[in-house]
Amino acid sequence: MLWLALCLPALPLQLAERGLGETLPLAIIEGPPQRPVIAFCNLKAAAAGILPGQKLAAAQALAHDLIGLERNLERERLALQELACWGYQFSAQVVPFGGETASGLLLETGASCRLFDGHHALDRRIAAELRQLGYSAAFGYAPTPRAARWIGLARLHGRQEQRDAFEPATLENVLAPLPIACLEWDAGTVATLQALGLGRLGDLLRLPRTAFARRFGPERLDDLDRA
């Protein structure tokens, strides 16, 4: 099997920007009504010094024309459902996913790559249709859904040199350089691992399995095994 992950960066922001006629400082906010904070912001807002985690009032002081829109989880869920329906033209197996870093789709593309005479042509077709729908995405290929998602997230984090894993035999070597931030583990676990000098997935794979599970939990070991 060959899975393709389509990782959509900041889906709430992409959905909001589709309805704007011009590019203005834009932020998606969440939290209690009396103290909303910035969850996502576009490039124009970031250029004004606005960052995720800031209070809305502080952000508005930096950009007086800032548009602040409340996050709509139901809209995100429906958008992923619509994208999943769209994805069935490329695969009989389509799985939507959501996460802190990105939302997106997983598609099993073994047959599709043969139909399109290779993954490059398939990529071009999917990317073009996503643009027409108003979305952008980072792509990642691997024999397992989890590994494909991690590779897509690595590209989303700026690792444009990240390789895909088209064959099971190449998977471990392809995954080894991945930053552990791509694993979507909680910030505390990531910080602890980095403090121990364990910044890459390959560093984790070299650790004794029993000791790793005892220190960080069997669910983390299961994540690695499922990749």
Positions of the model-derived regions?
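Generic, ordered loop/turn and secondary-structure boundary motif
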Residues: 12, 39, 51, 95, ...
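Short acidic/polar capping segments at secondary-structure boundaries
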Residues: 111-113, 142-147, 180, 199, ...
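Compact, charge-rich alpha-helical regulatory domains located at protein termini
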Residues: 155-227
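Amphipathic alpha-helical interaction elements
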Residues: 68, 131, 212-213
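Short secondary-structure boundary/hinge segments and terminal tails
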Residues: 77-78, 147-152, 211
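Structured, non-catalytic alpha/beta "coupling" segments that mediate domain-domain communication
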Residues: 121-163, 221, 226
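Residues that scaffold, gate, or flank divalent-cation-dependent active/transport sites
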Residues: 1-106, 111-113, 120-128, 137, ...
